[in-house]
Amino acid sequence: MKVSDVIKNCFVKLGYGVIDVTDAENLTAEQKRLVDILLCSVENVHSEIISAYFPFVMTENVTLVDEKLQYSTLINPKIVYPISLKRGAETRKIKAYPTYIQSDFSGEATFEYCALLPSYSLSTELPGNVPCWLLSEGVIAEYAYANNLIDLGAQAEKKFREGICALKAHSGAGRYVKPRRWA
């Protein structure tokens, strides 16, 4: 699913009808402004989904210099949190800092981390299993609250939160099985 698909869906839900948002020449000034606002909302909502519900996990071969790995050297430097650092088959301890991670060795390793997308545009492909209609509800809620449309924002946010909770419950993530004990 592309960002443009989400924004097209938002245009329909906001009452503008079916509009090709990728054709910038045929958009009015108001529609162009709305596309820019909705693009920012897509970034905010998708970042929340990645950070809180469904992480976008990346794995990368890296080189630690002086026992440090600078985030700026990664393919995607917008890191949310580190998951693991492996040297061969062995998982090594890491300590996260704002601009780098530190470990107890220097050299080659495999780094696994949760990251945000580097940038958002109409042609950006969104990873994950969140359907377009659900992401659109979150974007509309974000847009509505920013423009003081409280009722519309509350309705869209309710649908978004319920949909995310249902999707997370069915994805197998977050399930907790109570430990059983022998009597």
Language-model features, listed with the residues they occupy:
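Glycine-enriched, solvent-exposed interface loops adjoining structured elements
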Residues: 1-183
